[in-house]
């Protein structure tokens, strides 16, 4: 899978600067976020965010929220307008296909800041 990013602005970093993996999304929940607790007791919410582009096109970005952000997203319904800040991450998982198990890679945004954008 290829991940393409359109940037409105790019800056050259100082050679001593640490790498930055940061993304800001402004969009709408496509479906009710799924809130749950992991076996380790961590709170998590799966969110599918529609980020609108011009010409009536939207990008659908899978996001995960943790802790208080997960609890908050669990109260949101479909169509909630939110601003979300986080980092892009990838993770491996196994998918059973018939008798076989295939290794897959998922790309998602792990959010560390979420805000309801009141109109």
Report residues per predicted region.
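Single-stranded nucleic acid-binding surfaces, predominantly the OB-fold ssDNA-binding core
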Residues: 2-119
């Amino acid at each position: 899978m290829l991940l393409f990013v359109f940037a409105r602005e790019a800056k050259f970093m100082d050679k001593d600067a640490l790498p930055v993996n940061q993304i800001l999304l402004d969009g709408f929940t496509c479906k009710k976020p799924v809130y749950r607790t992991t076996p380790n007791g961590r709170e998590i919410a799966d969110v599918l965010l529609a980020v609108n582009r011009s010409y009536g096109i939207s990008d659908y970005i899978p996001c995960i929220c943790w802790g208080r952000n997960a609890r908050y997203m669990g109260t949101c319904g479909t169509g909630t307008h939110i601003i979300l800040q986080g980092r892009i991450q990838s993770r491996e998982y196994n998918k059973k296909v018939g008798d076989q198990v295939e290794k897959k890679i998922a790309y998602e945004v792990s959010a560390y800041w979420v805000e309801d954008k009141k109109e």
